[in-house]
A protein has these predicted regions:
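Residues that define the transmembrane beta-barrel architecture of outer-membrane proteins
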Residues: 14-20, 35, 65-71, 107-113, ...
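Flexible internal linker/loop segments at domain or repeat junctions
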Residues: 189, 193-230, 234, 239
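Transmembrane beta-barrel strands of outer-membrane/channel proteins
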Residues: 3-5, 39-47, 89-95, 144-156, ...
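Outer-membrane beta-barrel "beta-signal"
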Residues: 109-130, 288-309
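Residues on the lipid-exposed face of transmembrane beta-strands in outer-membrane beta-barrel proteins
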Residues: 22-28, 41-45, 71-79, 91, ...
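Flexible, solvent-exposed loop segments that connect beta-strands
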Residues: 52-62, 160-169, 203-221
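Solvent-exposed loop/turn segments connecting transmembrane beta-strands
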Residues: 9-17, 33, 100-103, 170-173, ...
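Repeated loop/turn-to-beta-strand initiation elements of outer-membrane beta-barrel proteins
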Residues: 79-87, 123-126, 188-192, 237-243, ...
Length: 309
């Protein structure tokens, strides 16, 4: 678990958020005994924002809530200076968002350089020596596994009225869905497949009967259901899996549900064959759709479990 502090240099409008997050990292490539290229990802929550308010904070057009999700990815070089100290430098990409649960939700993105000094509490002198023996890695049993995810969330909605004008919905709408994905496990770190994606989006095709936004009505449930197909790819790590998906709805009633969507998801292992699912659905790579918070089950799982020994 990590803790961070961000200075936004616009404290009256944005605040300076504090982050609390899970993190995981590993070596990508090793150039010699002291130098390596590594990655690290962070996922958690950020606190202390000053959200948009029409009277008190009208200039903040990007953040609408006091608590927001926090995503961060680092790629960096790591120099082992001594058994206790490392020097790191690289690039960090960060995203803050409330997952479309409040307006506004433009989100905030940043990219920057990373420089740090790491103190290793338990590392020993042997870290500089080349190991005399490395345990052989068993051949990976390639196979097809099946992931079933059930998720739900809530969202706000911008409704188009008049000549392209948008008004914010006065309420939040429920979202419920499932994913069923046969995944081919290529090796210890990668799996890919196709997913059948079903969703009920309570905000889909909401409309204003008078065209002025004074009243917003929901259509029949049939116009808020969709079934889609997406291609999936996942990077597998001990306890954590990061995945992406690209898909389109194939059965729907049109309108908001006629879309090309993208999915970014984190799966956190609970047992060998079950996991927590935290995902985000986008439309056309830039329009936020909804969070995907749920639970998943994996069937026909033949993945070796070294980290549980």
């Amino acid at each position: 678990i990590g803790v961070g502090y961000y200075n936004m240099y616009e404290k009256p409008q944005l605040g300076n958020p504090l982050t609390v997050y899970l993190f995981q990292g590993a070596r990508i490539a090793r150039f010699n005994q002291r130098l390596s290229l590594n990655y690290e990802w962070n996922f958690g929550a950020s606190f202390g924002w000053k959200p948009y308010h029409s009277d008190l904070n009208p200039y903040n057009k990007v953040i609408g809530s006091k608590v927001n999700a926090y995503l961060n990815t680092n790629f960096y070089f790591n120099w082992m200076l001594s058994p206790k100290f490392d020097f790191t430098t690289g690039v960090a990409v960060t995203h803050f968002s409330n997952g479309n649960t409040k307006f506004p939700n433009a989100g905030l993105n940043s990219i920057g350089l990373k420089v740090g000094l790491v103190y290793n509490i338990n590392r020993k002198e042997e870290c500089f020596a080349k190991p005399l023996y490395q345990s052989p890695v068993p051949k990976f049993p390639r196979h097809i596994s099946y992931d079933l995810v059930l998720f739900g969330s809530w969202r706000r909605k911008g409704v188009t009225i008049g000549e392209g004008q948008m008004v914010a919905s006065p309420e939040t709408y429920p979202v419920l869905g499932f994913n069923f994905a046969p995944m081919y496990n290529f090796g210890y770190k990668f799996r890919a497949g196709i997913s059948l994606d079903g969703v009920y989006d309570g905000s889909a095709n909401v409309y204003s009967p008078d065209g002025y936004g004074d009243e917003l009505l929901k259509p029949s449930a049939g116009k808020q259901l969709a079934l889609g197909v997406s291609g999936r790819a996942e990077y597998v790590m001990p306890y954590f899996t990061v995945g992406i998906g690209l898909g389109t709805n194939v059965i729907h009633a049109g309108g908001d549900l006629k879309s090309f969507y993208q999915i970014l998801a984190l799966k956190i292992e609970v047992t060998r064959n079950s996991f927590l699912h935290i995902g985000y659905n986008l439309q056309d790579f830039h329009d936020p759709n909804y969070l995907m918070l749920g639970f998943g089950f994996r069937f026909n799982n033949k993945y070796p479990t070294f980290h549980r020994r």
